[in-house]
From Swiss-Prot:
Residues 1-38 are annotated as: Disordered. It comes from Xenopus laevis. A number of compounds can compete with and disrupt triiodothyronine (T3)-binding including 3,3',5-triiodothyroacetic acid. Keywords: DNA-binding, Metal-binding, Nucleus, Receptor, Transcription, Transcription regulation, Zinc, Zinc-finger. Belongs to the nuclear hormone receptor family. NR1 subfamily. This is Thyroid hormone receptor alpha-A. Binds to thyroid hormone receptor element (TRE) weakly as homodimers and monomers, but binds TRE with much higher affinity as heterodimers with retinoid X receptors. Can bind DNA as a heterodimer with either rxra or rxrg. Residues 61-135 bind DNA. Gene3D superfamilies: Erythroid Transcription Factor GATA-1, subunit A, Retinoid X Receptor. A zinc finger (NR C4-type) spans 61-81, 99-123. One of its GO terms (biological process) is positive regulation of DNA-templated transcription.
Length: 418
């Protein structure tokens, strides 16, 4: 090693030397021949790669004067010299390097591949540190450590972000309390719905079937059973709305439009959160457990599929009473319902509920990634269910006997925009 490095002092020697036959030896040595052409290309092509901000524009490599790419092994070098130095140390190649011209070749970006010994000696001379080159095991360990640190920083940033998310203010907590209580006092059977539900008999559907225009059949017996619970279900939605702050301040006309628009959406939500994966049923109005086909044949058709699918997806969210209540408030205060007068006021009301809702979600700290935007997508799903039901209702009204429709059911769902 010391022998190979003994010629370092001649790197700065300017004198030209002669061969024994008197011919001059050029400083830009051509001593490598074909055997030295491996490695970098003779001229490094310009690269559009990343250049650190601490480098000056076009700062040269201290070894070969090519364009530097960063601080490598304690020196500012190009990628070629960095790789050459690393390979030399990792594979312990320097003891085998030799120079045909007494170790005095000038190294630049054109000649750097022509003499490995002189290039390596210059790397050492300018200060490149051999001890900073890692062997394979150390390199793997370093990469593992870097990845572990990266994961740790991500986790710390996530925790910091969660801690920085605002939670409800005192005014919002009061609003949340009122909305939650409004839901609990108007939600049939409350948390005891599983114990108190009754399953619709599986043999229901033996009565004559009325044909629907879209090819589906309406089981009149099932339809009759559903209409028995629809009036109290609608009444509970109305009672919920009346208990909400800001709703009573709206005009009577706007209140009616909002209630008609959201009624099916809120009833669908209340049914969906009572989806039971074990029995594959929804519990309607807190008392009647029905299967998908029963609800479908009872008049809802494809709307039944949408409500059941919503129930299955909501099961993963593990919503509490407050989250269900705030979802209902957001659905109620939809300023895009046709015919509204005070749209700006209603929009501000919805924004107030949405902000309190978001802050409450921050407080709950769910483990589901992007919980808040995913939950808001359920509002869109419920709006679609409401629109599909409005279309379905027109068919039901034509095909089913009028006497089967409760007056409140007709009052709420007639004249809805499809």
């Amino acid at each position: 090693m010391d022998q190979n490095l003994s010629g370092l002092d001649c790197l700065s020697e300017p004198d030209e030397k002669r061969w024994p036959d008197g011919k001059r030896k050029r400083k830009n040595s051509q001593c490598m021949g074909k055997s030295g052409m491996s490695g970098d290309s003779l001229v490094s092509l310009p690269s559009a790669g990343y250049i650190p901000s601490y480098l000056d524009k076009d700062e040269p490599c201290v070894v070969c004067s090519d364009k530097a790419t960063g601080y490598h092994y304690r020196c500012i070098t190009c990628e070629g010299c960095k790789g050459f130095f690393r390979r030399t140390i990792q594979k312990n190649l320097h003891p085998s390097y030799s120079c045909k011209y007494d170790g005095c070749c000038i190294i630049d970006k054109i000649t750097r591949n022509q003499c490995q010994l002189c290039r390596f000696k210059k790397c050492i001379a300018v200060g490149m540190a051999m001890d900073l080159v890692l062997d394979d095991s150390k390199r793997v360990a370093k990469r593992k450590l870097i990845e572990e640190n990266r994961q740790r920083r991500r986790k710390e940033e996530m925790i910091k972000t969660l801690q920085q998310r605002p939670e409800p203010s005192s005014e919002e907590w009061e609003l949340i309390r009122i909305v939650t209580e409004a839901h609990r006092s108007t939600n049939a059977q409350g948390s005891h719905w599983k114990q108190r539900r009754k399953f619709l008999p599986e043999d229901i559907g033996q009565s004559p079937m009325a044909s629907m225009p879209d090819g589906d059949k309406v089981d009149l017996e099932a339809f009759s059973e559903f209409t028995k619970i629809i009036t109290p279900a609608i009444t509970r939605v109305v009672d919920f709305a009346k208990k909400l702050p800001m709703f009573s301040e709206l005009t009577c006309e706007d209140q009616i439009i909002l209630l008609k628009g959201c009624c099916m959406e809120i009833m669908s939500l209340r049914a969906a959160v009572r989806y039971d994966p074990d029995s594959e049923t929804l519990t309607l109005s807190g008392e009647m457990a029905v299967k998908r086909e029963q609800l479908k044949n009872g008049g809802l058709g494809v709307v039944s599929d949408a409500i059941f699918d919503l129930g299955r997806s909501l099961a993963a969210f593990n919503l509490d009473d407050t989250e269900v209540a705030l979802l209902q408030a957001v659905l109620l205060m939809s300023s895009d319902r046709t015919g509204l007068i005070c749209t700006d006021k209603i929009e501000k009301c919805q924004e107030t509920y949405l902000l309190a809702f978001e802050h409450y979600i921050n407080h709950r700290k769910h483990n589901i990634p992007h919980f808040w935007p995913k939950l808001l997508m359920k509002v869109t799903d419920l709006r679609m269910i409401g629109a599909c039901h409005a279309s379905r209702f027109l068919h039901m009204k034509v095909e089913c006997p009028t006497e089967l429709f409760p007056p409140l059911f007709l009052e709420v769902f007639e004249d809805q925009e499809v």
